């Protein structure tokens, strides 16, 4: 059985993420979408909330499961018996950063990284940009799954109420 891990912060999951996950799922028997935990960053959503949103958003992909991990991604991949990491690339800046990570991961563990070019429809899309635009009232409804969009608007409203 071939498997891959598809890591990210997914804060929140976007349609761009889902495009890459779906395309990876078409290539591998199993894809583990892994929410990487960075304790130095305070996300808009908790890790548990991100997992819930990912599980809901990928429920129609039977060979996809969702998990989280704190530590080196290659350690997780080895623990799961996974030999490939899948990363989406939006452009040259992503490639420059991700290539160095891929080479380091390969050196540390022998785990290879496969790059999937992002669908041009989503090449501008990032979770950070979506959050920023939504915070200022911009319409991001076509950039996220419907339920994720609703949760994003609710969380932004909560944060606004807390700060006023």
From Swiss-Prot:
The record marks 17 as: Transition state stabilizer. GO terms for cellular component: cytoplasm. Its cofactor is Mg(2+). One of its GO terms (biological process) is coenzyme A biosynthetic process. The keyword Transport does not apply. GO terms for molecular function: ATP binding; pantetheine-phosphate adenylyltransferase activity. InterPro entries: Cyt_trans-like, PPAT, Rossmann-like_a/b/a_fold. Pathway: Cofactor biosynthesis; coenzyme A biosynthesis; CoA from (R)-pantothenate: step 4/5. It holds the Pfam family CTP_transf_like. NCBIfam families: coaD_prev_kdtB (TIGR01510), cyt_tran_rel (TIGR00125). Homohexamer. This is Phosphopantetheine adenylyltransferase. It comes from Rhodococcus jostii (strain RHA1).
């Amino acid at each position: 059985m071939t498997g891959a891990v598809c890591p990210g912060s997914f804060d929140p999951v976007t349609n761009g993420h889902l495009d890459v996950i779906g395309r990876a799922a078409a290539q591998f028997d199993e894809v583990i979408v892994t929410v990487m935990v960075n304790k130095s960053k305070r996300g808009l959503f908790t890790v548990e909330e991100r997992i819930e949103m990912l599980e809901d958003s990928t429920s129609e992909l039977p060979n996809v499961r969702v998990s989280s991990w704190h530590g080196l991604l290659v350690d997780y991949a080895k623990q799961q018996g996974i030999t490939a990491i899948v990363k989406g690339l939006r452009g040259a800046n992503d490639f420059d950063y991700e290539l160095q990570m891929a080479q380091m991961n390969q050196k540390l563990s022998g785990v290879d990284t496969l790059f999937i070019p992002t669908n041009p429809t989503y090449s501008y899309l990032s979770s950070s940009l979506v959050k920023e635009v939504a915070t200022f009232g911009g319409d991001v409804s076509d950039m996220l799954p419907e339920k994720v969009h609703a949760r994003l608007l609710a969380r932004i409203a909560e944060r606004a109420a807390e700060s006023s």
